[in-house]
Amino acid sequence: IAQCLVGSEMCIRDRCSSYVLEYLSNYFDITVFYYNPNIFPESEYTKRILEQQMLIGEMKGKHPISFVAGNYDREKFYELAKGLEHLKEGGERCFKCYALRLEETARMAKEAEFDYFTTTLTISPMKNAEKLNTIGAKIGEKYGVKYLQSDFKKKNGYKRSIELSNEFGLYRQDYCGCEFSVRDRKQESTGIKKK
């Protein structure tokens, strides 16, 4: 993998995954594309974007890491979630949300002539890497930009992300980001079951 990827440029759809940046910056010039219209409330969105920018400013990789913020298109997220609000995290609503964000990343990668695009979401034990990779590959074909398949949580990737978060003093959220995951977390913490 290193031989064919060195020196390439990559666009990453990110939510502050330190390990992914540490690892991929050995092989790519990286642009972190922060596109997360699902995040709720707006103060949480702002908090996460500032954390991402701080990390990029402090983290030194073998190759450059830059940052681009996408639009905070909350209405797009609510359009895709319509009728799926009742579903728990990890279901069809999430898959549509992955596709929305990966589609925007691929569009941006195509427009800026990146060699690859990927997502950091596979670092999370709560995310289905196989589903993310299937969605990413399909969108990559549509846009003519290679999708870098991954499961960053493996080979101690998730463990390393926690170590780096502690090292850099990063904020680690306890929910995915959307209003519905906030609701689910509150219900779990109070023991209330959804009907």
Where are the predicted features?
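Single conserved hydrophobic/aromatic residue that forms the stacking wall/gate
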Residues: 1-7
